[in-house]
Amino acid sequence: MSYLCGIDEAGRGPLAGPVTAAAVVLGPETPRELLIDSKRLSPIKREVAAAEIRRTALYWGIGWADHREIDALNIHNAALLAMRRAYHSITLTMRSRGLQRIPISQVLVDGKFSPDLGAETAVRAVVGGDGTVPEISAASILAKTSRDRWMIEKDAVFPGYGFALHKGYPTADHRESIGRQGPSPIHRRSFRLVPSQSAS
């Protein structure tokens, strides 16, 4: 038995917080009608879909690269790092269940770029895969909901920025709050946080 694994990430564009990736191997009971691009789902429907994916997927894993790693590596490389961590989370689960060989025949990644997962792993990037490949759609949903929850929790830790509303994305209100009270500890210092600021 061999499986197809889908990987996607969320959080390239925000000014604050981590970039988050998910890797998913679907199960036969996973409802395919729920598996569409996470951006096309309302927050409530995303959470419903995420709960079903976690309940019915054969394997799933989440990977993170935090704001410090984003600043050190750049957002592209940090996203690839989060993807590798998500995939390795799945492989660790498989090994913990006694599997000597990782039974994944191919990994499909949303977008134009894919992470290096080792010579034994076939990886292919699929442009628009979050809307066409169910495994990637599922990963998109898990990545988005996991990151959103993290940002909502940080809204209470760092009040005044509105993280629960915009999840760190560069809205006008978010930029205004940065200009008013300065960046929080989880803001990405390598990003242009306010319009007049040059990225360093």
Model feature map: region roles:
Residues M1-S200:
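RNase H-like, Mg2+-dependent phosphodiesterase core
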